[in-house]
C-alpha cells in the first residue's frame, strides 16, 4: 500500500490533460451538409472559424454560396461584410465542435434597397429629361 499511493500520485501528476480543440472542417462547399467532418486541431489552434460568402439579390436571384470551416490560432475580424449583392460572414468559437452551423454570410442585399439605390442614381437623368 505504501508503494501504491506514490505510484498512483506520480501517474496522475504525469498525465497531461488533452486540450486539443476539435472543429468541423471543409473548404468551399455549397452546403453545410458537406461541412460536418470533425477535425482535431493542433495545439496552437484556439478557435474554430467559419467563413460564409454569398452573392445574390434578396431571395430572388442567387449567384453563388461558399462555406469554409477550419481550425485557427487566431480569430479573424468577426464582422460581416455586405457590398450590395455580395456578402461575407465570419464567426469564431472556442469549444468542442462549436462551429456546427453556418456563419451569417448568407445576407444579401434587399430588393427594396437595390431598387431605391437605382432610382436615386437615375434621378438626375430623369430630372434633366423631364417635362
Swiss-Prot record:
GO molecular function: acetylcholine receptor binding; acetylcholine receptor inhibitor activity
Gene3D superfamilies reported for this sequence: CD59
Keywords linked to the UniProt accession: Cell membrane, Disulfide bond, Glycoprotein, GPI-anchor, Host-virus interaction, Lipoprotein, Membrane, Signal
Xref: InterPro entries: Ly-6/neurotoxin-like_GPI-ap, LY6_UPA_recep-like, Snake_toxin-like_sf, Toxin/TOLIP
Annotated transmembrane regions: none
One biological process term in Gene Ontology: host-mediated suppression of symbiont invasion
An annotated GO cellular component: synapse
Domain of life: Eukaryota
Propeptide residues according to the Swiss-Prot or TrEMBL record: 102-131
Membrane topology: Lipid-anchor; GPI-anchor
SMART domains for the chain: LU
Localization in the cell: Cell membrane
Residues of the UPAR/Ly6 domain: 21-101
Main location as per UniProt: membrane
Induction of its expression: By retinoic acid; in promyelocytic leukemia NB4 and in myeloblast HL-60 cell lines. Activated by IFN-alpha in monocytic cell line U-937 and in peripheral blood monocyte cells.
Subunit architecture: Interacts with CHRNA4.
Name of the protein this chain belongs to: Lymphocyte antigen 6E
Source organism of the structure: Homo sapiens (Human)
Encoding gene (name): LY6E
